[in-house]
């Protein structure tokens, strides 16, 4: 993946926090398959926008606003994924191809 949107970063952070409990920028870079400098740049932007708390070499945290947005985005994404699987009977393999 060449680039990712703010939505991708927020959903990725949310997912990793659900799975691991905490997230480092390197974890997010690996998860999104993006370079660490690109992740750092976007995290600085998200920090300026008041969505995440980002300090170099420390764990990432959502602000309450960022957490709420990430939660809603993740919920919407999961609803769509469930619809594709359960109603349209699209196989997981095909969903994963177009997931992001």
What is each residue range found by the language model?
Residues 37:
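Key DNA-contact positions within bacterial/archaeal DNA-binding proteins
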Residues 47-55:
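A short, conserved structural fragment
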Residues 2-34:
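N-terminal helix-turn-helix DNA-binding core of bacterial DNA-binding proteins
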Residues 78-100:
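Amphipathic alpha-helical dimerization/coiled-coil segments
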Residues 43-44:
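Short, hydrophobic-biased segments on the C-terminal half of alpha helices
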Residues 58-77:
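Basic, amphipathic "hinge/linker" alpha-helix immediately C-terminal to the N-terminal HTH DNA-binding motif
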């Amino acid at each position: 993946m060449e680039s990712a949107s703010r939505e991708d970063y927020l959903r990725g952070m949310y997912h990793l926090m659900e799975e691991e409990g905490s997230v480092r920028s390197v974890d997010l870079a690996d998860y999104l398959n993006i370079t660490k400098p690109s992740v750092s740049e976007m995290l600085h932007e998200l920090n300026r926008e008041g969505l995440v708390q980002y300090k170099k070499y420390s764990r990432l945290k959502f602000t309450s606003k960022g957490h709420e947005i990430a939660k809603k985005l993740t919920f919407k994404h999961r609803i769509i994924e469930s619809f594709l699987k359960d109603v349209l009977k699209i196989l997981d393999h095909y969903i994963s191809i177009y997931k992001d």
